[in-house]
Amino acid sequence: VVVGEWGDADPWAAANDDAYASLLAHVRTGPRGPVPVDLDALGWEWGTPRGRVRAAAARLEDLGILSRRPDGSWWYDELSDADLSDTLDFWVALVGPALRATIPALTPELRAELDRRVARARTTAALRLPEYPTAFSAACQFWFEHSPNTLVRSLGLRAFERMRWARVPTQLWSVHEVHTWFATTSRAVESGDPAVATAAAEVMDGLFEVHRRNVGIPRTHRPADDTTEDRVGPVGRTLLRDVRSGALVVGSTHRLEDLVTRTGATPEQVHGALRWLHDLGLVDDGDGRYRVGQPSLATWRDTMELLTGVFTHGAVHVLPGLRGPALEEFRMLVARARADGQVRDHRYTESSFAVTRFLSEQSGNRWVREALRLAMARLAYALPEAPAFRQWDAEALWLTLDAAAGSGDVETARAAARRFVDVARAHVDDVTARWGTMGS
C-alpha cells in the first residue's frame, strides 16, 4: 500500500483544499450530469497525488454531487430537488446548535467581526445590491466558522458547501426582509440567553420557508425508506471493538497496511472504517498514519448540542404530521419513557433516546438521518462508558410531545422542541458535574 494513496481519514483537512477546488471546478464547468469522472486521469493531468484527488472526491461524495458505483467508477450529477430540499432543512437544523455554542465564546474581536458582517448584510439588503446574497451568507456562516463546537462547525460548513454547489449556477439567497433575524441574534448575543438563540433559529427557519417559495424548491415529503445512506460495515465494527477494548491502545499510531493485515480486509474497506472512526472522534490521522484518540467529555458535549438540532428538525417537520401506525408507535415510545422516568427505571436512558431516534428515522431527509446516526454513535462511544440519562423530572417534555404528535400544530411542536433543548442542556450539566466520578 502506497502511503497516502487512499487519502485522509478526514478528507476535509486543509491539505486537500487545492485538489478539492480543482475537482469542483472540473465538474462544474462540464456537462450537468450524470457523467463519469476519471480521478486517476485528472490527478495525472494536475500533477496531484492520488490520495489528494481521492480525498477531494470524498468531499464531493459527502456533498452528494459525486457518487461511487459498485464497479468503482465515480459519477457527477447535480442534486435533485428532493436532496436540495433536504440540504436546506439540514443547514437550518444546525443553526440553533451553532448559535448556542458560539455566543458564549465570543471575544471582543469576534464581536467586532460579527458587527462588520451584519452591517454589510443589512446595507446590501436595504439597497438591493447584487452582492447581498454573498454578504448575507457571510454573516450567517460566521456562527459556524467561529463555533467552538468542532462537530457542529464541521457539519455546518459542509452543509453550506452542499447548498452552494448543489446546482449550476449557484442558487442565490432570495429573501431581503431579514431585519428580525439580525435583531433576534443581536438580542441573543447581548443577553447570552440560550432560549433567545433558539428563537433566532426559529426565525431563520421561517426565512428559509420564504426562500423555498421564491426559488421553487418545495419541502420534501418522501418516506424514510426512500433515502440512501451508508451504514458501518463489519470492518468498522472490528476496529471499533479493538479501540474500545484497548487492543488498539489510546495514543498508539498505525499504518494503513498494518490495519489491512490485522483485519484481513481490503485497503478501501479499512480506509472507510477509519473515516467512520474519525467521524466518531476516536481516530486522528496525519502523514499516512492513524492515531487512536483519547475519549473526551468535549466530544460528548459537542455531540449533545448536535442532537438538539436534529431533534428540533424532527419535532417541527415530522411530529405534527404523524398518522396511523407511526403515530401509535411514537405515543407508545413517549409513554414508556415517561413511565420509566417516573419510577427512575434504569431503562430510562434507552427509552428516552428511542424517542429521538424514532423522530429522525421517520424523516425522509438523508442528511438528518445520517447526522442522527452519527450523534447516537458518538454519544455511545465518546466516553469510556456512556453516561446515564437522569433528567427524571421531564414530565412537561413528554406531555408536550404527546400533544404535538399528529396535531398538525407546528407551534406545539416547536414548544416541545424548546423543552427538549432545555432538558438536553440539563443533561449536559449533570454529566459534566459527574465526570470526575465516571472513571478514566
Named regions from a protein language model:
Residues 80, 128, 192-193, 296, ...:
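Acidic/polar helix N-cap motif
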Residues 1-100, 104, 212-313, 320, ...:
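Short linear motifs at protein or domain termini
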Residues 17, 21, 92, 96, ...:
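Amphipathic alpha-helical repeat elements characteristic of tetratricopeptide repeat
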Residues 168-232, 237, 384-440:
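C-terminal all-alpha effector/ligand-binding and dimerization domain
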Residues 39, 147-150, 192-193, 363-366, ...:
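Short loop-to-helix capping motifs
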Residues 95-105, 141-148, 311-321, 357-364, ...:
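Helix-loop "lid/cap" segments that line or gate small-molecule binding pockets
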Residues 24, 28-31, 99, 103, ...:
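Regular secondary-structure segments
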Residues 109-170, 182, 199-210, 325-387, ...:
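Conserved amphipathic alpha-helical segments that form helical-bundle/coiled-coil interaction surfaces
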